[in-house]
Amino acid sequence: MVSVPTGLRPSAVPGVRLPALADQVGAVMAGPDRRAAVPDVTVTGVTLRAQDVLPGDLFAALPGATTHGARHAAEAIERGAVAVLTDAAGVAQLTGGRTTPTLLHPRPRSVLGELAAAVYAHPSERLTVIGITGTSGKTTTTYLVESGLRAAGRTAGLIGTVGIRIDGADIPSALTTPEAPALQALLAAMAEQRVDTVVMEVSSHALALGRVDGTRFAVGGFTNLSRDHLDFHPTMADYFEAKALLFDPNSPLRAHRAVVCIDDEAGREMAARAGDAVTVSAEGQPAHWRAVEVAPLGTGGQQFTVIDPAGVQHRAGIRLPGHYNVANCLVALALLDAVGVSPEQAAPGLLQTRVPGRMEEIDAGQDFLALVDYAHKPGALRAVLSSLKRPDRRLAVVFGAGGERDPGKRAPMGATAAELADLVVVTDDNPRGEDPAAIRREILAGATESGCAAEVIEIGDRRAAIRHAVAWAGPGDVVLVAGKGHETGQRTGEHTRPFDDRVELAEALREAVGPRKAQG
């Protein structure tokens, strides 16, 4: 029975003396005498959130976008924090007669990962950690790797966008992209649960913002690179460089071994940067791992022959459509091989892999294919629609674009949808603080300017948009609801209402199937 302590922390932490931590990260005592001795207290946890503090914690008071964490130091201390780490601006905001030791560092976030790793006894060194980065395919590849590990008898942990899993059990958590202290605590909890191998998604944000600092990666995997997160990264080059931190020989985050898909130019550049990468290709590139003889498998699945670095052939199959998922599977197989799991050991697990909200089929007995997918950027949308487009059937796509995210991808997504689908229903995604109608207009402009013959309509209400596409579909057609995947809420302004594309699509299908059967 898998259990995880409250707060996704280990239940037993020996602790580290505060003077040793200060020496390790180059912090000094705040106050007029920077050479003052650091009090000899024991730290047993680290957190950024005052409300998460447990007795014995060090509270990291960091500068934020709108406020400074030091404003919450008093609450943290009241909850049992034995020390505070902050910068000069934070020290200036601390109130009261400060009896709790306060460490000063000019860039506290930059040392937080290593500090937390030390407090939790360097958990990644007690585990085999596999990190997967790339624009698309991270979630699918982590699930494939987890399935392969478990098929080989390994006790696996998974950390990613959809959630956290330990030995196949879902662990409730809001930690989609854990900050460094939460990640180190989680890894320590997994080690305590006797997990031996952890596979985790590693986003560009996590790499650039230090969220994986202190983590030692046994293997790093790269899937692909296309436009995304340009609201955070100023250029695609900057985006690439963030991903490269997992592979560059000069990076402190560099994985011990690298697996890189070279089916796009960024992958080939990443392999060259890594220097000694194991390469994979599903597109005929000369690579260590290749896929050939790809053929359909059942409804929506694929089977293919894998050629390994020694030239040995293996049969593999996945219950996931789309040629890009063949590439994801190759990355997974190469990563598994790097940690001692053979294709034959992994194959049964790969064949059973289901990924929440990733090309997830919704079947209510209808006579057409209905899918939900997380594709929310131009490259991913193109890959998904291309995999579904066939001359013998019509294709409908329902999608929108997130507010307060890279606006430059909206028109290209509209153009891509109009090029590849027969019906394009532009709707709301997560508008957040933006005007939903304005977001839709940008998508519609791209679709209109593409000059394609698709029928393009606008239905802002996502529930109604899904029902329109379902009503449109006929026997053998395909309906894809894209953009939100596994998400269970829709955010407008500051309010998030319950909304799950999978639930809504299933309800729409059930409503439609009854009348159709009656007519039949």
UniProtKB/Swiss-Prot annotation:
Its main location: cytoplasm. Meso-2,6-diaminopimelate binds at R405, D429, N430, P431, R432, G483, E487. It is an enzyme of class 6 (ligase). Pfam families: Mur_ligase (PF01225), Mur_ligase_C (PF02875), Mur_ligase_M (PF08245). Keywords: ATP-binding, Cell cycle, Cell division, Cell shape, Cell wall biogenesis/degradation, Cytoplasm, Ligase, Magnesium, Nucleotide-binding, Peptidoglycan synthesis. Belongs to the MurCDEF family. MurE subfamily. This is UDP-N-acetylmuramoyl-L-alanyl-D-glutamate--2,6-diaminopimelate ligase. It comes from Mycobacterium avium (strain 104). The lineage of its organism: Bacteria, Bacillati, Actinomycetota, Actinomycetes, Mycobacteriales. The gene is murE.
